[in-house]
């Protein structure tokens, strides 16, 4: 039981791990160099390591809800099932991007479909185990790689009244890749944080009451991530702090044209040593991301 509690104390990152490898010459492989295949874990946003060449990641996360979780009138538990189809592009020639993005600007592309369950432990506590398996392609090196990742996310409701709803977030995460003709790599991480949501009085959007959603999380990487930023220097990252702000509806998803979002906002990420920074779109809670 103690080990199980420790397991729940962790999980969700790697989403920022490796697209920075675009700036690394292929004949140089520093110890534990971040591989481009890890770009599949990024959310849509701008990423930078120590003012080195920036990378923009565009992640399309379509998903299909097969069944929603909850408890029926008899108290029987219903496990939610969600099928995910994330398609990720890594863009590395930012100065060359015109008004309309062309394929020549793409450094990487990956497709990693997966399944995610939502298990309601009780009325306050829910778990989300998930697994994704797919492949990616890097244009400059003409390299393919198998990609897989999975983990367990936890959300525990600490309080809910008319003024504020807040929850404890935890997660553990494990991911890996296998390039052609090269050895495989693996990464693990653990996350803990708090999530808040409060109504915005009489403010509405599209006839629906608005809520202000925000969270703060800390993610620890079990292994340092090394980024080769120039010929003489490698920067290492061991953790990530993240703050997210967003607006959402009280009872249903937000919608722009035909695309639905849980919420709309931004998140800011940085490492403790200040070498890594990122600004990402904040479209879902870390629990349902």
Where do the language-model regions lie?
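Residues that define the transmembrane beta-barrel architecture of outer-membrane proteins
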Residues: 52-62, 79, 105-111, 144-150, ...
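Residues on the lipid-exposed face of transmembrane beta-strands in outer-membrane beta-barrel proteins
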Residues: 58-68, 111-119, 133, 152-158, ...
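Transmembrane beta-strands of outer-membrane beta-barrel proteins
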Residues: 77-85, 127-131, 148-150, 164-172, ...
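Detector for outer-membrane/organellar transmembrane beta-barrel domains
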Residues: 143-226
């Amino acid at each position: 039981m103690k080990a199980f509690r420790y397991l729940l104390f962790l999980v969700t990152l790697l989403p920022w791990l490796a697209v920075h490898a675009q700036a690394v010459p292929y004949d140089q492989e520093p110890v534990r160099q971040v591989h481009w295949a890890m770009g599949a874990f990024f959310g849509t946003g701008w990423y930078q390591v120590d003012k080195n060449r920036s990378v923009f990641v565009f992640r399309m996360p379509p998903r299909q809800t097969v069944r929603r979780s909850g408890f029926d009138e008899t108290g029987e538990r219903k496990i939610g099932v969600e099928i995910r189809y994330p398609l990720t592009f890594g863009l590395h020639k930012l100065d060359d991007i015109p008004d309309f993005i062309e394929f020549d600007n793409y450094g990487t592309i990956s497709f990693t479909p997966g399944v995610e369950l939502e298990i309601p432990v009780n009325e306050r506590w829910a778990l989300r185990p998930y697994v994704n398996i797919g492949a990616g392609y890097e244009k400059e090196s003409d390299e393919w790689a198998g990609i897989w990742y999975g983990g367990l996310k936890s959300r525990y409701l600490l309080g809910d009244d008319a003024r504020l709803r807040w929850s404890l977030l935890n997660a553990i995460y494990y991911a890996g890749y296998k390039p052609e003709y090269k050895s495989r790599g693996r990464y693990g991480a653990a996350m803990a944080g708090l999530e808040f949501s409060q109504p915005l009085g009489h403010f509405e959007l599209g006839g629906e009451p608005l809520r202000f959603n925000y969270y703060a999380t800390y993610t620890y990487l079990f292994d340092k991530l090394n980024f080769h930023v120039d010929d003489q220097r490698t920067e290492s990252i061991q953790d990530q702090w993240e703050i997210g702000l967003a607006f959402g509806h009280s009872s249903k998803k937000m919608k722009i044209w035909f695309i639905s979002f849980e919420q709309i906002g931004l998140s800011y990420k940085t490492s403790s040593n200040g070498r890594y920074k990122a600004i990402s779109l904040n479209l879902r809670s870390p629990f349902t991301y």
